[in-house]
Amino acid sequence: MAALDIGCTCPNRDGTLDTRGCIFCSAGGSGDFAASRQLSVTDQLNQAKELLSSKWTPEPGKPSLIAYFQAYTNTYGDLDRLLSCYEEALSSPEVAGISIATRPDCLSDIILEGLDRLQLLYPDRFIWIELGLQSIHDHTAARIRRGYPTSVFYDAAAKLHARRIPFIVHLILGLPGETRLDLLESIRAVNQVHPFGVKLQLLHILKGTDLALLYEAGKLPVLTQEEYLDLLTSCIAALSPDICLHRVTGDGPRKLLIAPQWSLSKRNVLNGLHALMKQRNLRQGDNYEPGTSYTL
């Protein structure tokens, strides 16, 4: 996966909704691993391929790279410019498809129509949308300064389903004030919406964020690795077996990460998850509660 920065901003940053952003979001707009926004999409992809070359060898003639439009809100801005960036990635012979990180309140009919056209132009490439939900609970949304009510997420999900555009939902484990029950309610709600995929992300405390101020003031407990794995196994067991699990952890940039430091060892986290799932004899979907799909 090649993380890209195409110079977008966010309504939570540019004054449309706020200027401070979500309380956990870094100055890089959650795109701290992306290449420089001063580079073209093609140059960023080439740089990513070079960085990945030590652990990834593309099969000749077979596209296998995901172009991940990650930094800030990648459907927010000039439509022609956005579509041009998407198309530049889709036209790369090494790119299998694109994944576009955005907010549910930034999916206008115009941008969706543009994505429809690209799906027709590039039928052999996939186009995914990644929605930053974080929590289904509006009280949590207010606490983290998300900037939109959960009803907007449901509307966006319905629009994407109607246009057959696959989407992935981001949820964060360890948000301020959230309980295990809150988190499992978010999982159940996502099951009902039934996206193509889900990313489960550990809450990182990064330098320069309002979350860091809460942590440094002693007002924010941070999950231990054991607590995180306990929550994570519960989430995976409750998640529909038909939903693709794209991420189960994350590693914040070393130069910015304040806590939890244990998250820097992704291998330890993954090994711990495998061991705990095996110990508890759990698989994805074992505790899934089928219900009426939101999209029906």
Q: What feature does the model see in each segment?
A:
Residues 197, 205-296:
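Auxiliary Fe-S-binding modules of radical SAM enzymes
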Residues 49, 53, 115-123, 157-162, ...:
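Surface-exposed amphipathic alpha-helices with a cationic face
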Residues 28-48, 52, 56-79, 94-107, ...:
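Core AdoMet radical
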Residues 79-87, 108-119, 183:
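Distinct, well-ordered alpha-helical segments
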